[in-house]
Amino acid sequence: IFCFVDQMPPGMRQTLYFKDDDARLSFLQGNYITLTNLTEREAQRIIDLRISPINVSVHTTDPQLHCTMLGNKNALRSLDYIRAFCKAGIVMNGQIVVCPGWNDGDQLRRTLRDLTEMQFSSCSLVPVGITKYRQGLAKLRPVDAATAAEIIDIADEYGRENLRRFGTRRFFCADELYLRAGRPLPQAEYYEGYRQLENGVGLMRSLEDDFLAGLATVDVPAHFSPFTIATGTAAAPFLRGLVQRAMGDYPGLRGQVIAVENDFFGHTIDVAGLLTGQDISAQLKKRPLGDRVLIPLHMLRHGETVFLDDYTVERLSQELGRPVQVVGLDGFDLADALFAPAESRQDNGRS
């Protein structure tokens, strides 16, 4: 009912419509899979070879609801595989995409209770992403502030129980839930080594801590180069706070953060990683931007300089009339980028 691939507009490159549910790539590349395509022979092979970790999209442990949400008659089998893997000691990282009215509230409590008893390794809770392209799909509503707060409270309730009984919280909420609920981010210790970082869990806490550490050791140039950071509406206030901190520590530094609305997928999509080059260009080209524009690495296709809409960084730079610098994913990269000269281009992260 919520698969992002099913909510894509027509006419995009074919690779974006590919639904990858291969257990081998879950192990090798960290893909989250539903296990619905897994055969009994393949499942036994995972157990025999002790292949770990496996990243699994859980969503719910209610059998009927599980089938409904995944739209697959084999979904019941995937729950059996999860139980078998847990019993065999296979490390599994899970995700629950919380859809209000479907798998939140009491259903979420049931899922967390079941995963606790299975000794599931770790599980992230993330809000459903809803684009404007949902023709023919089930009705969904976005996670609002009250729902986000309830999700956090439920996760914390079971997290405290797990911490007391087993020494791990097991359940972790994505940063986006704290932003929507208007609640402060947990401290670094909460995230237990950031096991769910790629799922947006603890990314902002890690970024802030590394950024503040980087500010203390950054190479300060003789002349500062004014900048603009382009990001999604969700992270913009957080990044503004970091930039203001940097400008307070270094009075000559000048920069701004611009929140880019997602006109391409719809304004309910507020994360930077789903912004397109055309939206950034349209919303920035008539504004004062300083000497350069900074964008986060996760806006781009892995290993390339291409946005979701096939815009290139070079094209965006030409349309904005200034260098577009790609900033790596940690806070040290961000601190370095604020002080970089206009003519340099950030690479894909620190070497």
Spans of model-derived segments:
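Conserved Radical SAM active-site core
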Residues: I1-Q119, G129-Y158
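Auxiliary Fe-S-binding modules of radical SAM enzymes
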Residues: M12, T116-Q119, S124, G129-S351
